[in-house]
């Protein structure tokens, strides 16, 4: 799992926007018992993910073949969680831009 300070959010609506030049992107999140739900929007297309896991794991979410050029990723904490989760944490541990 990537190590570093990461970017943490627990509050509903907390958002980070990343603009990159490439063909794709990999986002590494920490999934564990405190994991919440997150919305990831890539070039205007949104999808929700659940970051809960019964033990700590690296959750890799990736997008490839976006086409060479500039792309925008928006990561938004939804402030919700599934039954069994003890938190609403969204922790982006690392990202990697895929070359064109």
Q: Residue ranges of each PLM-predicted region?
A:
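Glycan-recognition surfaces in beta-rich domains, encompassing non-catalytic CBMs
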Residues: 1-100
């Amino acid at each position: 799992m990537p190590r570093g300070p990461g970017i943490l959010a627990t509050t509903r609506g907390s958002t980070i926007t990343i603009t990159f030049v490439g063909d794709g992107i990999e986002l590494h999140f920490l999934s564990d018992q405190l994991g919440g739900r997150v919305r990831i929007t890539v070039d205007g297309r949104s999808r929700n993910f659940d970051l809960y896991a019964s033990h700590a794991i690296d959750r890799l979410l990736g997008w490839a073949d976006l086409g060479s050029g500039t792309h925008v990723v928006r990561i938004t904490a939804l402030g919700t969680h599934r039954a069994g989760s003890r938190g609403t944490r969204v922790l982006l541990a690392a990202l990697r831009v895929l070359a064109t």
